[in-house]
Structure formats: structure tokens, C-alpha cells
Swiss-Prot record:
Tissue specificity: Expressed in all tissues examined including 12-day embryo, adult heart, brain, ovary, kidney, lung, small intestine, spleen, thymus and pancreas.
Compositional bias segments (type: Basic residues): 163-173
Protein name (database record): Kinectin
UniProt membrane topology term: Single-pass type II membrane protein
Location of the region described as Disordered in the Swiss-Prot/TrEMBL record: 49-181, 197-216
Residues with glycosylation annotation: N69, N1031, N1066
Subcellular location: Endoplasmic reticulum membrane
Organism: Mus musculus (Mouse)
Length: 1327
């Protein structure tokens, strides 16, 4: 408990306020006493101790002054009690509230003992005071009132006894001892009074609230003390510090007491007339001198005792004055005490009220705390639940975020792996390029070295040719041999070229095959993309079809709701008819009561009671039927709730089945069959709905017929009322009977129609049973399909959608069945209403018979009225009433016409509303068609976007090759393609079926429009018929009124043939003129007696007239009441309609909310499906990339093999060059041998000069060949590796070999460079 919540704090506030109020009053009353105390304290502070040396002189002066002023002391002593009176009575009220006692250390027990002892010691105290005054010579008492404290402290009992003993002794001996004891006794109360004066302000606040009872007791005790002990008031205690100070204080107090008493003595000395003014002035001067001397004197013990004795001598006068003054003051004090007690009682009451308020506030605070604690607990629970939900949601978000991060990390890892692999491939390509460049550089260096060597050889050969021109013949033979070797080398080179061409053709074939494979893969990829697009389009088409089916279901639900509202309106109309019948029954009961009052027939009353009992039973039956309908509605609401729960369960199952997203083509044909059966069922349901609409329209017409019959009955009842008031003829009764017969026939026709309707309902129930059987078979088939789907998980989503559709169709069928049941109940209620109407018609027949009897009785009564004046007046009144009735009828006819128009207008408005609803439905369907077209366009756009996305994915596939681990075979791809093609065909068929459904719906809308126009024409024809009927009835009524007027005129003319009135006048004016002339005729012929008789009869007629008027007024009041009841009923019906509309709106809102939730769940499903598809696409892309990576690796391996083959070719070529080099060495050796032979034959050449010419010719040819070789070597940068150091062979033999070798080397180098360039280009393309 905190401080502000504790009850102590609440209790302390009012107590503090009360203490503050008391302190305020106490301080206000205590101001005089407080001023006196301040003055006394100042006086005490001004006392100055005189010197001891001047005591004797002062004593002498005091003795002289006492002798001189002896008389004055007596007069002054008389005034001392008055001073006491003024000092005690003025602050008495304030002194009573001083809280602190004299002895602060005393306990409550000692205080009680002292209060008891005060009463006993009052006489002893008086004696003690007298004895002390006689015995003591030192004035040791201060004149102060005892009422300064609440409990005056009397002397203890031991001290009182000692004082009594000392009083018996001599004064002279024991004076000093008594003075010492008095000083000791006075010390304690004086000290206590100092404590009180110092702590008075602080203790007043706390003491007032605690000791109110003690203050009240002490007030009464102090008053008693004032009455009984006047001398004690003059002897209060003061503190005494030492002997000198006591003396000075006594003198000071005596002077203070004498000053006011002297003034009073001067006022009272007016009685002493003998004294002279001069003596008074001298006495005043002496008294002033005496006062001054007292102020400066220091008394001894003897002198003080003398002063006390003189004062005691004057004490008798003081007692008398005190008694006189106290008597006047007691009444004032008592009055003040009473007022203060009243104030205290009022303050106590206020305190009690404040305590009660505090208690109430505490209770309210406790209740509010409890409420707040409950609210806080609820809020804490709510906050806890919200925090839990928030934590769960955060955990879900965190998990999803972690999953996304994991996916991103995986994707980054894949990218990094791809980049690493790409870098590795680039490195390998660089290595290969470096190797190729190194090989080319090496070949070029070798060729350049060989060319240099060849040049050197050519120079040497030229020199040798110049020297050895004579040896050409032998060289010719050698040339032939060399030519043969060259031909062999050429053949070998041709074979090498053929092998190179074969290698190139093999490489080209491999590249062509690789390109064809790539093209095949690209075509397959394009086909797959097309398949994906087709699947996407199929899914979108299926979604669109689902949405269309949902929209159709919503339309069906809305139409059912509209039908329910129409049926409710029909029920309301039936209730209105029943209420109108009840009102008519009430009117009939009132008529019966009036007739019973006139005829006093008990039999009629009993019959009426029976009828009322029967009608009460019927009402109870209707109420029971209404209760059953309400129970049925409650059961329907429970069924709706069950359906909603089923929907939620189905949604949960849908979420479970979403994981199984793989599709297969095994159940496609079965799905198509199911869809066809569903379409057939939808057509059947539409036919049933149309039949129900026709039935509702027929029942509406039947209700209209019943309402018209009810109106006709009401009009007939009104006719009966007017007939009773106007005494109609028997023809009217016959007409009523005919009308009743016609109504019986109509009721029979209605019963027949109801029977036919029941037959139709039975047939429809059979149809519904057949549909149920079909649905049961379909559900079984669906269950079988589920069993199949456990093995084959494909097309699960489609089957689930079909299940949903089947469930929805079952729900629709159930709703149709419920509607049929409701219609059966309505038919039963209508049959009950028909029976009630039959009973009412029978009752009306009985009432008509009773009315006929009553009319006969009234005719017998009216036949007694024979005299002319009564007849005239009666006829005039009848004519007036007829006029009023005619006017009322005209008004009623107009009102009925308006009512009929109003009745027709709401029906017309209902039909118009129906037409508008149909038009709105047509517009909705058109809007849906437009939406479908827009959806198709959107789908085409989506396809384009998907194609673009596929292109983008292709680009991504090139980056994600290494993630592909497995690739499906071509057979699986073909199966998938065939399945997708089948799905595409199915979707096309569905599109065609949807288009046919749209066209069928358009045809239906056109038919509905035509029907609406026909209904409008039928309404117009019915309105015309109603207007014609109204006109006919008004004409008939006017003719009837005119016939009655003519009959009345003829009657009057027959009665008074002498009276003549012009016939051109109106009926009312004609009656007035006829009345005046008839009165004139009767006045001339009648006698006094006849006049009296006539007057008597006139009075009777007037009484009858008044009675009839009263009855008319009653009927009018009844009609007004019925109209008011009808208006109230209409209002109640309108209110109920508004309530039902509100409920319908709420149900529609609930349905919309459910639809929105369903659409949201569908969107989530679509989103999940798309995510699954994306995952599948990514998986496929991964597989495709892995396949491509494998292909790239295969290509890489092929390239490596090709490079190896090229290296092998290079090695073979090098081997061939080495062989040619060895052959060249061998030929050099042969040339050396030939040189030796040439040296041998050199001698022979000198002889053969004839042959030198030939050699010269050969040399010329050799020079030409050498020039050609030099030109070829300068053009080409290739040469032979053969080094011929010392060759004696002629240049004509070596030149063709060099040429052939250089040509072959150049060709091989160019071919190798081309191959390397092609390899580099392919690698760059792949990267």
C-alpha cells in the first residue's frame, strides 16, 4: 500500500481541515489573552533589581506612605476583585481551550484523582487562603485567573494538612516557615505556566483534536469554581526565582491590579457626595505617588505581611463585587458554552459525513482498482498473445529470410564455381596459344637457319661450277639418278598431302556434326520453351475457367438470395393478409357486441366466443408454424456454418495437396469426362432454376389473387357496415351470398392450383434424387481417381479443383433442396391460410344471417314510427347519411383506386426491379466477356514476356553449365512433349466449350429480355383492367344513389300530395324546401294533442337517431383504429423488411469477405505454383547447363586429341626430314667418290676438247636454273634442313630437291597455322 492509496491519508485530510478551523476560531478568541501575556512578559523583562544598600530607606518611605494612604488601600482593595473580574471573564472562553495541564509529567490516573479531590477540598482551600493571608506577610501570589489551564493544580493533600496545622499556631512565630512553604508550592505551578506559555502555540493544534471531551468537562468545573470560590481566582501561582524577584513581582502585580480598580473607584465615588473635589484630586495625586513608590520599593517580610493584612480586610467587599459580577457573567458563559457545543456537534457531524464519504471513496477506489486490475490483466494477456503472434511471425520471416539467404549463397557459390572454371579454361587456352606460338617460332628459326646454310652452299656451288666446268658429263649421269630420287620424294610428299587433306576432311566432318548437334539441341530447347508457354497458357485458361465458374456460382447464390428475399416478401404479404383478416375479425366482434347489446341474446355471445376460440387456435397454429420456420432458418444458418467449416477444411486439404505438383497425362481423359458431366449438371441446375422461377412467378400471381380476394372481402364487410347503418334491402344480402359463392369457387381453383404445384414439387424432388445419385456416383469416381493418384500424382490440382466444383454443386443442390422444402412449407402455410379463409367465409355467412335477423327487428321497430314529421326527419337524416356515405364511398373508391394503383405500383416496381436485375446480369455477362477478351490479350502479352524471360534464361544457362549433373533422355522428352500436346488440345476444347457457354448465356439473356417485355405488357394490361373495374363500380354506385334519391322523393310526394317543390333543385335543397312546406301544412291542420304526440315521437326518433349516430361514430372509430393498425402493421412490415435487408447485406458482406479470402488463398496457391514452376525451371536449366558443360568437356577432349594428332604429324614430318637429311649425307659421300673419279678423269678431259662445248652449253643451263632457284628462295621463307658441307655435286642435281622440300614445308606450316587459328576462334566463342 502506498501513501496515496492508504485510508489513513483519506482520514487525515478532513481531521486536518477541522483542526485548522478550530485553531482559527481559538486564535480569534484568544487575541486579548495573548496581548495580556505579551504585556506581562515585557513587564517582567523590565524589572530591574535594586541595590541592597537602599532597602532601609525604601522601607521607611513605604511605611510613611502606608500610613498616609491607609484609606486609599481600602478603596483600592475594593477594586481588586473587579480587576480579577475583568481579567478572568474576558478571556474565559479562550482559556478553556488551553490544552496543556500544569503538571506535564502527570499521568491520566493522577489527573482523575485530582479531579475527584477538588470537590472535597473546596472548603479547605478557602480556609487555607484565609489563614495564609493572616499568617503571611510577604506577598507571594500573583493575581491571575485559574482558568488559564484546563485542570487547575490544587496543592497536594499533605501540604493542605500542614497548612491547617500551622493555621492554629501563632502568626508571628511561624510566619517565616509558611512563607518558605508557599514559595515552594508556588515554584511548581509557575514553572508549569512558563512551559505552557512557551509551548502554547505548538500544543494547541495537537491538543484540540485529542481533548475535546476534557475541555467540555473543565468548562463546567471552571464555571462552578467561579461561582463557589471567588477568592481562589485572586490567588494563582507564579514562578519565584529568588526572594528579591518575588517581592518585585508582587509589587508589580499589585500596581497592575490597582490601576484599573482605581479608575472604577473614581467612577463609584460619585455616591460619596460629601467629599470635595479638592480631596479627590489630592487622593489621586497620593495614589499616583503610592504607585510610583511601590514600583521602586523593596518590601521586607513584615512590610509584606502588613500589606496582605490590609488587603484581607478589604476582601469582604471584593467577595460581594465578585458575586454580583459572576451572576451576570454566568448566563453569558453558559450561552457561549451552548453555542460552542452546537458548533462542536455540527463539526462532529461534518466529520462523520466526511468519514462516510472517505469510506465511500475508499470503496470506489477499491472497486476501480479491481476493475483496473482486471483490465490490466486482460490487456496483459492480450499483449502476451500479440507478442507471441508477433514472435511467431518474426520467426517465420526470419526462417524465410534465412532460406532466401541460403539460396543466394548457393547461387553465389555456383557463380563462383562457373567463374573459376571459366578462368581455368582461359588459362588452358593461353597455354595452348603459347605452345603454338613457340612451335611456330621454332619452325621459323629453323627455316631461317636452313636458308642461310643453303645460301652459303649456293655460293660455294657457284664457285665450284666455275672451277669444274669440264665435269658436266659425269654430272649428267648423276643428275639422272638425282631426278629419280626427286621423283620418289615428290611421290612421298603427295602422299603426305593426301593424308593432311584426309585429316582436314575428318576435322570438317566433326565440326559439321558438332554444329548439327548444337542446332538439334537449340531446336529441342525452343520446343521445350514452346511447351512451357503452352502449359502456362493452359494454366491461365484453367484459372480463367475457374474464375468464371466461381462467378457463375456467385450469380446463382445471388439469384437464390433474391428468391429468398422474394419469398420473404411473400411471407410478409401473407402476414399482412392474416393481420387484415384479424382486424376484420375484430370489427365483426365489435358488431356482434353491439348487436348483443341491442338484442341481449346470450346465444350469439356463446357462438362468438366459440368463433374467437377457434380463431385463437388458428393464430396459435400460425405462431407454431412461424416458430418452426424460425427453427428451420436457424438450422439453415447452422448448415451454412458447417459449409463454411467444410470450405476451410477444403482449403487446408488444398494446401496439403499443393506439394504434389507433378503432372501426368494418365487422368486427362477422365478429367474431360468429369468436366462434361459437370456441364451437364450445370445445365440441369439451370433448368431447375428456371422451373423454380416459373413456380415463384405463379405463386406470386396466386398471392396477388388472394390479396385481391382479401380486398374484395374487406369491401364487402364495409358494404355490410353501411347496410347495417342504412338498413339495406334483401337484394344486397343476396348479392353478398353470390359473392361468397364466387369466392368459394375461386378458393377451389386455388386449391387445385396448389395441388398441381405439389405434384410438380414431387416430380422435382425425384429429379433431385436422380441428381443426388449421379453426384454420389461422381464422388465415388473421384475417390477411385484419388486411389489411382496415389500411384500417379500428376494432375492432382485439376482433380482437386473438380472436387471443389463437385462440392460446390452438391452445396447448390442442397440449397435447391432446401428451397424446395421451404416452398413446400409455404404451400402448406398457404393451404392453412385457405382453410382459415374458408372458415372466415362461413363465419361471415353466419354473421350475414344474424344481420338479416337484426334488420327485421329494426324494421319492426321503425314501422312503429308512423307519423309524418318523424318520417320526414328520419328520411332527411337518412338522406344526409346517404350523402355522407356516398361521399365516403366515393372517397373510398378513389382511395381503393389509389390503393390498387399503389398495390399495382409496388408489384410493377418489383417487376421493374426484376427486369433491371436481369439487365444488370446481362451487362455483367457482357463485362465478363470483355474481361475474358482482355484476359486473352493479357495472356498473349504474358506469353511474349515469358519468351523474353526464356531468352534471358538462356543467357543464364550459358553461365551455369557446371551445375548440371543429369540430363533426361530423348524418349522422356518426347513423352513430356506428347503430354503437353494433349494438354494443349484439352485446353483448346475447354476454350471452345467456354465460348459455347458464353453464346448460350447470351441466348438466355435475350430470352430473359423478351420475357421481361412480356411481363411489362401483362402489367400494363392488368392496370387497365383495374382502372376499368374502378370506373364500373363508381358508375354503379352513383346509379344506386340516384335510384334511392328518386324513391325517397316519390315517397315524400305520396305522403304530402299537396306539397309541391320544383324538381330542378339538388336533392338536399329539395328536401329543405319540402320540409318547410310540409311543416307549414302540418301547422295549419294539427291540434295541440297531436303536436304533443308528435313531439314525443320526435324525441324517440331523435334518440334513435342519436343512437344510430353513436353507432356510426363507433364504426368510424373502429375503421380509424383498423386503419391505424394497418398503418402500424405496414410500418412494422417495413421495419422487418429493412431488418431483413440489413441481414441480407451483412450476409452478402460475409460472402464477399469469404470470396476475398478464397481469392487470396487462390492467389497464394498460384504464387506457390509459380514458385514450384520456377524451381523446376531452375532445376531444368541446371541440368541443361550440366549437359552443356559435358558437351564442352567432350569438345575440349576432341580438340586436345586433334592437337595431339597434329603433333604426331609434325613428328612424322620431322622424321621424314631427318631421313631426307641422311639421304643427302649419303649422296654427298657419293659425290665425294665422284669427285675422286673426276680427279682421275681430269687428265682424260684435257684430251676431250670436243666435249667441252657440250659442257659449256650445260653450264649455261645450270646458271639459268640457279637464277630461278635464287628467285624462289627469296620469295619463300622456307628451306631445307639438309646441310651439305663439302659437296662436289653439281647444282643442277640439288636444286629440284630443295625446291620440293621448301614447297612442302611451307604448305605444312600454313596448314598448321590455319588449324590453330580455327581452334582459338572456337575457344573464344565458347567463353
Amino acid at each position: 500500500m502506498e501513501l496515496y492509496e492508504s485510508t489513513y491519508f483519506i482520514v487525515l485530510i478532513p481531521s486536518v481541515v477541522i483542526t485548522v478551523i478550530f485553531l482559527f476560531f481559538w486564535l480569534f478568541m484568544k487575541e486579548t489573552l495573548y496581548d495580556e501575556v505579551l504585556a506581562k512578559q515585557k513587564r517582567e523583562q523590565k524589572l530591574i533589581s535594586t541595590k541592597t544598600d537602599k532597602k532601609k530607606a525604601e522601607k521607611k518611605k513605604n511605611k510613611k506612605k502606608e500610613i498616609q494612604n491607609g484609606t486609599l488601600r481600602e478603596s483600592d482593595s475594593e477594586h481588586v476583585p473587579r480587576d480579577f473580574k475583568l481579567s478572568d471573564a474576558s478571556p474565559a472562553e479562550d482559556e478553556q481551550f488551553v490544552p496543556a495541564p500544569l503538571n506535564v509529567a502527570e499521568t491520566s490516573s493522577s489527573v482523575r484523582e485530582r479531579q475527584k479531590k477538588e470537590k472535597k477540598q473546596k472548603p479547605s482551600l478557602e480556609e487555607q487562603v484565609i489563614k495564609e493571608s493572616d499568617a503571611s506577610k510577604i506577598p507571594g501570589k500573583k493575581v491571575e485567573p485559574v482558568l488559564v489551564t484546563k485542570q487547575p493544580a490544587p496543592p497536594p493533600p499533605l501540604e493542605a494538612a500542614a497548612l491547617k496545622k500551622k493555621a492554629g499556631q501563632k502568626k508571628s512565630k511561624n510566619g517565616s516557615e509558611e512563607q518558605d512553604k508557599k514559595v515552594e508550592m508556588l515554584m511548581a505551578p509557575s514553572k508549569e505556566q512558563d512551559v505552557l506559555l512557551s509551548h502554547q502555540d505548538t500544543k494547541q493544534e495537537g491538543g484540540l483534536g485529542k481533548k475535546k471531551g476534557l475541555s467540555k468537562k473543565q468548562k463546567s468545573e471552571n464555571v462552578a469554581v467561579l461561582v463557589d470560590e471567588p477568592l481562589i481566582h485572586a490567588t494563582t501561582y507564579m514562578p519565584l526565582d529568588n526572594a528579591n524577584s518575588n517581592l518585585m513581582m508582587d509589587k508589580r502585580e499589585i500596581i497592575d491590579m490597582i490601576k484599573p480598580d482605581h479608575v472604577e473607584g473614581i467612577q463609584k465615588s460619585g455616591t460619596k457626595k460629601l467629599k470635595i473635589e479638592t480631596d479627590k484630586e489630592n487622593a489621586e495625586v497620593k495614589f499616583k505617588d503610592f504607585l510610583l513608590s511601590l514600583k521602586t520599593m523593596m518590601f521586607s517580610e513584615d512590610e509584606a505581611l502588613c500589606v496582605v493584612d490590609l488587603l484581607k480586610e478589604k476582601s469582604g467587599v471584593i467577595k460581594e463585587a465578585l458575586k454580583k459580577s459572576n451572576k451576570g457573567e454566568l448566563s453569558g458563559l453558559l450561552h457561549q458554552l451552548q453555542e460552542k457545543e452546537r458548533l462542536l456537534s455540527a463539526m462532529k457531524e461534518d466529520a462523520a459525513a466526511s468519514k462516510e464519504r472517505c469510506k465511500r471513496l475508499t470503496q470506489e477506489m477499491m472497486t476501480e482498482k479491481e476493475r483496473s486490475s482486471v483490465v490490466i490483466a486482460r490487456m496483459k494477456d492480450r499483449i502476451g498473445t500479440l507478442e507471441k503472434e508477433h514472435n511467431i511471425f518474426q520467426n517465420k520471416m526470419h526462417a524465410s529470410y534465412q532460406e532466401t539467404q541460403q539460396m543466394q549463397m548457393k547461387f553465389q557459390q555456383v557463380q563462383e564455381q562457373m567463374e573459376a572454371e571459366i578462368a581455368h579454361l582461359k588459362q588452358e587456352n593461353g597455354i595452348l596459344r603459347d605452345a603454338v606460338s613457340n612451335t611456330t617460332n621454332q619452325l621459323e628459326s629453323k627455316q631461317s637457319a636452313e636458308l642461310n646454310k643453303l645460301r652459303q652452299d649456293c655460293g660455294r656451288l657457284v664457285s665450284e661450277l666455275n672451277e669444274k666446268t669440264g665435269k658436266l658429263q659425269q654430272e649428267g649421269v648423276q643428275k639422272k639418278n638425282a631426278e629419280q630420287a626427286a621423283t620418289q620424294l615428290k611421290v612421298q610428299l603427295q602422299e603426305a598431302e593426301r593424308r593432311w587433306e584426309e585429316v582436314q576432311s575428318y576435322i570438317r566432318k566433326r565440326t559439321a556434326e558438332h554444329e548439327a548437334a548444337q542446332q538439334d539441341l537449340q531446336s529441342k530447347f525452343v520446343a521445350k520453351e514452346n511447351e512451357v508457354q503452352s502449359l502456362h497458357s493452359k494454366l491461365t485458361d484453367t484459372l480463367v475457367s475457374k474464375q468464371q465458374l466461381e462467378q457463375r456460382l456467385m450469380q446463382l447464390m445471388e439469384s437464390e438470395q433474391k428468391r429468398a428475399s422474394k419469398e420473404e416478401s411473400l411471407q410478409i404479404q401473407v402476414q399482412d393478409i392474416l393481420e387484415q383478416n384479424e382486424a376484420l375479425k375484430a370489427q365483426i366482434q365489435q358488431f356482434h357486441s353491439q348487436i348483443a347489446a341491442q338484442t341481449s341474446a346470450s346465444v350469439l355471445a356463446e357462438e362468438l366466443h366459440k368463433v374467437i376460440a377457434e380463431k385463437d387456435k388458428q393464430l396459435k397454429q400460425t405462431e407454431d408454424s412461424l416458430a418452426n420456420e424460425q427453427d428451420h432458418l436457424a438450422s439453415k444458418e447452422e448448415e451454412l456454418k458447417d459449409v463454411q467449416n467444410m470450405n476451410f477444411l477444403l482449403k487446408a486439404e488444398v494446401q496439403k495437396w499443393q506439394a504434389l505438383a507433378n503432372e501426368q497425362a494418365a487422368t486427362a481423359h477422365e478429367v474431360e469426362k468429369m468436366q462434361k458431366s459437370i456441364h451437364v449438371k450445370e445445365d440441369e441446375i439451370r433448368l431447375l432454376e428456371e422451373q423454380l422461377q416459373h413456380e415463384v412467378a405463379s405463386k406470386m400471381e396466386e398471392l396477388k389473387i388472394l390479396s385481391e380476394q382479401n380486398k374484395a372481402l374487406q369491401s364487402e364487410v364495409r358494404k355490410l357496415q353501411t347496410a347495417v347503418s342504412q338498413q339495406p334491402n334483401k337484394d344486397v344480402v343476396e348479392q353478398m351470398e353470390k359473392c361468397i359463392q364466387e369466392k368459394d369457387e375461386k378458393l377451389r381453383t386455388v386449391e387445385e392450383l396448389l395441388e398441381t404445384g405439389l405434384i410438380q414439387v414431387a416430380t422435382r424432388e425425384e429429379e433431385l434424387s436422380a441428381i443426388r445419385t449421379e453426384n454420389s456416383t461422381l464422388t465415388r469416381e473421384v475417390q477411385e481417381l484419388k486411389a489411382k493418384q496415389s500411384d500417379q500424382v500428376s494432375f492432382v490440382s485439376l482433380i482437386e479443383d473438380l472436387k471443389r466444383v463437385i462440392h460446390e454443386k452438391d452445396g447448390q443442390i442442397k440449397s435447391v433442396e432446401e428451397l424446395l422444402e421451404v416452398e413446400l412449407l409455404k404451400v402448406a402455410n398457404k393451404e392453412k391460410t385457405v382453410q382459415a379463409l374458408k372458415q372466415e367465409i362461413e363465419v361471415l355467412k353466419e354473421e350475414i344471417g344474424n344481420a338479416q335477423l337484426e334488420k327485421a327487428h329494426q324494421l319492426s321497430v321503425t314501422s312503429q314510427v308512423q307519423e309524418l314529421q318523424n318520417l320526414l326527419r328520419g328520411k332527411e337524416e337518412q338522406v344526409n347519411s346517404m350523402k355522407a356515405a356516398l361521399e365516403d364511398r366515393d372517397r373510398g373508391l378513389t382511395g381503393r383506386g389509389t390503393c390498387a394503383q399503389v398495390c399495382s405500383t409496388p408489384q410493377f416496381e418489383e417487376l421493374e426491379s426484376v427486369l433491371k436485375e436481369k439487365d444488370n446480369e446481362i451487362k455483367r455477362i457482357e463485362v465478363k466477356l470483355k474481361d475474358t477478351e482482355s484476359d486473352v490479350s493479357k495472356m498473349s502479352e504474358l506469353l511474349k514476356e515469358v519468351q523474353e524471360e526464356n531468352k534471358f534464361l538462356k543467357c543464364q544457362l550459358s553461365h551455369q553449365k557446371h551445375q548440371q549433373a543429369s540430363f533426361p533422355s530423348q524418349e522422356e522428352l518426347q513423352t513430356v512433349i506428347s503430354e503437353k500436346e494433349k494438354e494443349i488440345t484439352d485446353l483448346c476444347n475447354e476454350l471452345e466449350s467456354l465460348k459455347n457457354a458464353v453464346e448460350h448465356q447470351r441466348k438466355k439473356n435475350n430470352d430473359l429480355r423478351e420475357k421481361n417485355w412480356e411481363a411489362m405488357e401483362a402489367l400494363a394490361s392488368t392496370e387497365k383492367m383495374l382502372q376499368d373495374r374502378v370506373n364500373k363500380t363508381s358508375k354503379e354506385r352513383r346509379q344506386h344513389v340516384e335510384a334511392i334519391e328518386l324513391e325517397s322523393k316519390d315517397l315524400l310526394k305520396r305522403l304530402f300530395p299537396t306539397v309541391s317543390v320544383p324538381s330542378n333543385l339538388n336533392y338536399s335543397e329539395w328536401l329543405r324546401g319540402f320540409e318547410k312546406k310540409a311543416k307549414a301544412c302540418v301547422a295549419g291542420t294539427s291540434d295541440a294533442e297531436a303536436v304533443k304526440v308528435l313531439e314525443h315521437r320526435l324525441k324517440e326518433a331523435s334518440e334513435m337517431h342519436t343512437l344510430l349516430q353513436l353507432e356510426c361514430e363507433k364504426y368510424k372509430s373502429v375503421l380509424a383504429e383498423t386503419e391505424g393498425i394497418l398503418q402500424k402493421l405496414q410500418r412494422s412490415v417495413e421495419q422487418e423488411e429493412s431488418k431483413w435487408k440489413i441481414k441480407a447485406d451483412e450476409s452478402q458482406r460475409m460472402i464477399k469477405q469469404m470470396q476475398s479470402s478464397f481469392t487470396a488463398s487462390e492467389r497464394e496457391l498460384e504464387r506457390l505454383r509459380q514458385e514450384n514452376k520456377d524451381m523446376e525451371n531452375l532445376r531444368r536449366e541446371r541440368e541443361h547447363l550440366e549437359m552443356e558443360l559435358e558437351k564442352a568437356e567432350m569438345e575440349r577432349s576432341t580438340y586436345v586429341m586433334e592437337v595431339r594428332e597434329l603433333k604426331d604429324l609434325l613428328t612424322e614430318l620431322q622424321k621424314k626430314l631427318d631421313d631426307s637429311y641422311s639421304e643427302a649425307v649419303r649422296q654427298n659421300e657419293e659425290l665425294n667418290l665422284l669427285k675422286t673419279q673426276l680427279n682421275e678423269t681430269h687428265s682424260k678431259l684435257q684430251n676431250e676438247q670436243t666435249e667441252r662445248k657440250k659442257v659449256a652449253d650445260d653450264l649455261h643451263k645450270a646458271q639459268q636454273s640457279l637464277n630461278s632457284i635464287h628467285s624462289k628462295i627469296s620469295l619463300k621463307a622456307a628451306g631445307d634442313t639438309v646441310v651439305i658441307e663439302n659437296s662436289d655435286i653439281s647444282p643442277e642435281m640439288e636444286s629440284p630437291e630443295k625446291e620440293t622440300m621448301s614447297v612442302s614445308l611451307n604448305q605444312t606450316v600454313t596448314q598448321l597455322q590455319q588449324l590453330l587459328q580455327e581452334v582459338n576462334q572456337q575457344l573464344t566463342k565458347e567463353t
